Each structure stands twice: as structure tokens, then as C-alpha cells.
Regions:
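Non-catalytic cap/lid and distal C-terminal segments of serine-dependent acyl enzymes
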Residues: 1-232
Length: 232
């Protein structure tokens, strides 16, 4: 058996300082290849002391999945750019960004740069250095809020790579219904990823996110997204 390890590495991010990437490798058999989940907001995933909001307790979740026999996964957490988070995790190509008053100062949509970093720097490094599967049925992308928007975007841009997308409290409200409809009409192909979309509605902002998520569900159905590739 190979023991559990949590690695932190630095990878070059375009026009900014090197970015910290966390790689959690659970205990596994020697030579075993594991499914892999690429997640945004890496500093929020593993360490309660690295964020004022607490962590996702990802290690505990993976250990619980191991014990229940459901599966075993490498978790790759990509740190956000702190003051640049909103910019990094908001794509430009979907449409004109709405609700700018909610976003960071000096906001500029640069989600495509993050997507390029994920696809051409992070994933190749992980696949070359850690025991992960590379086929889409064992590769997922996941995030929340702006990170949920980004995971949705990356999954739609690269359905040949991602078989699953975890999309939590996604910032779909950043674009109009019309822009979303136009974007989806150009992206849905035969073999799309499974979408697990979830949001609450506990406060005013969450209610706005909830309503925009319902809107996106409707558009997915209107665009004939495969029903068996979405959670209800």
C-alpha cells in the first residue's frame, strides 16, 4: 500500500505569481490509478487555518468514500488569486458580465486564462507526476460560487476531458438569459459530462443564485441537454 500524502506545488500562472496547487493522494495500492477531481479555491479545501471561512474538509469526505467502498480519488485544489478571484473565475466569452457591483475592484473577466492554466499546465503536471486516470470517465472538475461557474465553463469547453462537473452555488447570474442561451446552443455535443448542480436559497444573494440556476436548468432542457446527464 502507498500511504496518504498531501503535496503543495507551485506552477507558473500567466502574468501573475506562481500559483499554489494542492494534490491530495489517498492511500492506494501500488500501481493503482485513481480517479481525479480538479477543484477551484484550493486554499479552502484542506486546511481550516488557510481561510477565514473554514475548509470543505475534503480529506474527510474522501476517507468516508473509501470506507463505504464507493471510490477513491485524488483531489487537486488550485488556489484562487485572492483579490483577483472574481476576475480569474469569470469567463469573457459567455457574454457581457452583469452585477459588476458585486465583483472585485478592477474586475476584468479572465476565466479563459484560468481554463488555459488548468488544461495546459495543471492537468499535464498532475498526469505526469501522480497516479491518476486520464480518461474522461474518471476525471471531474468542481467548484462553488465563481468557482462553480468556472467548473461549468471548463466542462462545457472540454467535454472530451471531463466526464463530471460539480457545480455548487454557481454564479450563473453573471450573464443574461439571452447570452446563456446563445452560449449553450454552440456547446452541446453528443457526449456531454454529467452535471451535479446544487445551490441553496438562504439569503438574498443565494436567492438570486437559486433563481439563475433554475433559469440555467430550463435552458439546458430547451437545448436538449441529455436528461440522464443532470441531477434533478
Amino acid at each position: 500500500m502507498v500511504d496518504t500524502e498531501l503535496h503543495t506545488i507551485k506552477l507558473p500562472y500567466p502574468d501573475k505569481d506562481d500559483r499554489t496547487v494542492w494534490v491530495y493522494v489517498p492511500s492506494h495500492s501500488d500501481g493503482e490509478k485513481l480517479l481525479v477531481v480538479y477543484m477551484t479555491d484550493g486554499q479552502n479545501l484542506f486546511d481550516d487555518n488557510s481561510t477565514p471561512h473554514g475548509s470543505w474538509e475534503v480529506v474527510k469526505a474522501v476517507e468516508n468514500e473509501q470506507k463505504s467502498g464507493v471510490g477513491n480519488a485524488v483531489i487537486v485544489g488550485i488556489d484562487n488569486g485572492n483579490a483577483w478571484r472574481d476576475s480569474e473565475l469569470t469567463p469573457k466569452s459567455i457574454g457581457e458580465v452583469q452585477h459588476l457591483e458585486m465583483l472585485c475592484e478592477d474586475f476584468k473577466p479572465e476565466g479563459e486564462i484560468f481554463d488555459n492554466f488548468l488544461m495546459n499546465t495543471v492537468i499535464p503536471y498532475v498526469e505526469n507526476n501522480f497516479p491518476v486516470c486520464t480518461d474522461r470517465q474518471n476525471v471531474a472538475v468542481c467548484g462553488s460560487s465563481s468557482g462553480g461557474l468556472m467548473s461549468f465553463f471548463s466542462a462545457f469547453e472540454h467535454p472530451e476531458k471531463f466526464g463530471y462537473a460539480g457545480v455548487f452555488s454557481p454564479a450563473f447570474l453573471c450573464y443574461t438569459r439571452e447570452d446563456w442561451a446563445k452560449y449553450l446552443s454552440t456547446k452541446i455535443v453528443e457526449n456531454m459530462p454529467y452535471l451535479y448542480i446544487y445551490t441553496g436559497n438562504g439569503d438574498e444573494l443565494e436567492e438570486m443564485i437559486f433563481e439563475s440556476t433554475e433559469m440555467l436548468y430550463e435552458l439546458l432542457e430547451e437545448s436538449f441537454y441529455p436528461y440522464d446527464r443532470m441531477n434533478e
